[in-house]
Design a protein with these regions (language model features):
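N-terminal small-residue-enriched
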Residues: 1-248
Length: 248
């Protein structure tokens, strides 16, 4: 907190951004994960509709939703339609492999349930939802990612944001950020916001670390508020719009 109080204003513009592990995964959850739920896909409201088997991300991106992780915040033995939860590989090396499917939307799509039907309680009708959703480890270390970034923003801690679930357009505040200069973390900055489109950003991820961490949250949707995990290793988006209080 003291570091941020002394920080200068973040410059704005398009630049590489290194997003640290853990809660950084909220961007994938919000801007991409909801678009992989069958409740959106079956109605044609998702940018991922009819794209199974197609390249939807860079080859470094493998995304998983796993409701079976022991003691994880979003885990459960069976979903709210009585189907056993499972490990669902959504995107593998950039290729769209699966959606999160409940029984109702599965019938519409001619697909089997993936154990992804959830609701807050009996007052809500269950529908397809995420459990523990994360981007898997990649081949790089965080140190390598920083060292290979000549100039950019290091988003160490992410804050809140807003998303248009139909398009994946998002903006998220950076709670703790630093300028990367000459492959090294330099001065702290404040007032940074990441602005982009989730499905497009997936193609811009060009380095993925090996330090996967998960963070806990509550996800609200038509079937109520449910516990979910988000997660990712440190990763680099080679170009994203950074909104800052300081113009270039």
């Amino acid at each position: 907190a003291v570091t941020i109080l002394k920080a200068g204003l973040c410059p704005s513009g398009k630049m590489p951004v290194v997003i640290d592990n853990g809660f950084g995964g909220v961007i994938f959850h919000e801007a991409c994960g909801h678009g992989l739920e069958a409740s959106s896909v079956s109605k044609g409201l998702s940018v991922f509709s009819s794209k199974l088997g197609q390249k939807v991300a860079s080859e470094f991106v493998t995304a998983i939703d796993d409701g079976t992780i022991p003691n994880a915040w979003g885990s459960l033995n069976v979903d709210d339609e009585g189907t056993k939860t499972q490990r669902n590989v959504l995107i593998e090396n950039g290729i769209l492999k699966s959606y999160l499917v409940d029984k109702l939307n599965g019938r519409r799509m001619n697909m089997a349930s993936t154990g992804s039907s959830r609701r807050q309680n009996y007052r809500f009708a269950p529908t397809s939802r995420m459990t523990n959703t994360f981007i898997a480890n990649g081949p790089h270390t965080r140190a390598e990612i920083i060292a290979n970034t000549e100039y950019g923003l290091y988003a160490k801690s992410m804050g809140g944001g807003s998303v248009n679930p139909a398009t994946g357009d998002f903006n998220f505040a950076v709670n703790e950020g630093y300028i990367i200069r000459n492959g090294q973390i330099a001065e702290p900055v404040r007032g940074a916001t990441l602005i982009g489109n989730g499905p497009q950003i997936l193609h811009q991820i060009d380095m993925v670390g090996e330090n996967l961490a998960r963070a806990q949250g509550m996800c609200g949707a038509s079937s109520g508020s449910i516990p979910t995990d988000v997660g990712q290793p440190a990763l680099r988006v080679k170009e994203i719009t950074v909104g800052g209080a300081k113009g270039e």
